[in-house]
Amino acid sequence: GLPAVVLLRHQSEAERRRLLRKVLIETGKTATEAAYIWTRSPARLERLVVEIRGQEHLDASLAQGRGLIIASPHLGAWELMGVYWARRLRLHSMYRPPRQQEYEALLTWVRERSGAELLPATPAGIRRMYRALTEGHVAGILPDQEPPEAGVFAPLFGQPAKTMTLLAKLSQRSGAPVIFGFAERLPWARGYRIHFLPAGPEIADPDPERAAAALNRMVEACVQIAPAQYQWTYRRFRRQPDGRNPYHGQPL
């Protein structure tokens, strides 16, 4: 499958198969835990977080007083990240409205019940996000969603990937620092470990392609911590510069 190929292109076929098996198991966990996260109280969900690594990066970024962008890839329990941090920070989360409009009200309720403001990825939503950052608030963004229109190609695990430029623009205009974070799912239902990784200044480089490459390097750094927990079923590489589709003939 493509997940195994991009992660283990220099490893043996047996190692690729082992990873692919783990990916399928973790994908199933992602689907089943989403319903749990959506239906349990935020206070109950908070107790599932048993460890935070990199808290000092979060604290140092907040101490700058210029707002903060938390980039959380589709890795581990990304729904839990929003619930957990909305109770601690003035969080505004960007989202892409679902194709099935009947689900939008449900998703908005689920994600705002902890206190976050959910903003659609529209011009009005982006303006509101920028204002929130200038007021010292926190913006939550999924950095690995393929942009529908704007964006540039940048390498991700050695494969070209259409990558957003929104995060870099928000950081450039507002001066807000950027950190990456995700909730790693621990084995045997032992809870979740949150990781924070600081992004360097290149994440807001004025050159869109350099900024996008820096963004994808940070996504890679997160994924390498828990590679099987990445949402490889999201066809991140389906748009290529030469128009080909690398997923043809792939099981995922």
Descriptions of predicted regions:
Residues 1-6, 19-43, 229-233:
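A transmembrane-helix-recognition feature enriched in membrane-embedded lipid enzymes
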Residues 3, 38-68, 76:
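A short, well-structured juxtamembrane/interface segment
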Residues 51, 119, 197:
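General small-molecule cofactor/ligand-binding pocket signal
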